[in-house]
Amino acid sequence: GVLVNYTGIACPNLIDQYDQSDLPLTESACGGIFMLPREVYEKVGGFDDDLFLYHEDHDLSWRIRMMGWKLMVLPDSVCYHHYNFNKGVLKFYQSEKNRLHILLKNFECKTLCLIAPAIALVEFSQIVHAFFHGWFLLKLKSYMEIASQAIKISRKRRKIQAARKVADKEIVSLYQSTISVAGLKNPLVDYFLNPILK
């Protein structure tokens, strides 16, 4: 599974860790390896075509949980995935655009209002990060893309919220309160961002 912060930032902090036999429920399946019944996939509408790369697995998992199904980790299963944490140009743009897309689409209104300050803080941090890496225009492009899809996102949102069986309170309890990525140490994240997000 994949650990995710409630602002939508993926937190792959179990990479290169020893296997555990008592892994808890997870809020998001990893798109690299997961299995689910076709009936479940079709019931939740499958993958969102607007999420070409990144967070498409998070979105599908979220909608599965909203319909009352659980996501389990099977520690005895083995899959080899040559993963390389690389925050390149394409990944940054697609990840940022899709992260905001699914937050706006899947959270209840009251949840969005409650976490709006945290989302604003993370957005500010991502803008600063983008500026120093030469990706500022890509970050702006992600906002423009979200704005251009506002009506479409709103339609999807109404459909999803009308069909949901599980409230955010249960789902959000599985999200991470901090941002943590294995092998990545950033003093600004560790000593500024995470204490506030908690």
Located regions from the model:
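Generic detector of well-ordered alpha-helical packing
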Residues: D57-L60, H82
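Short, hydrophobic alpha-helical packing/hinge segments within bilobed ligand-binding/sensory domains
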Residues: L60-S61, R99
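Active-site-adjacent helix/loop segment of glycosyltransferases
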Residues: M66-V172, A182
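Aromatic-acidic/polar surface patches that form glycan- and anion
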Residues: A29-C30, F34, K43, L53, ...
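Acidic/His-rich active-site region of diverse nucleotide-sugar glycosyltransferases
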Residues: G1-F52, H58, M67
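Glycine-rich phosphate/pyrophosphate-binding loop
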Residues: Y18-T26, S154-K198
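Conserved short hydrophobic patches within well-ordered secondary structure
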Residues: L53, S125, A130, I196-K198
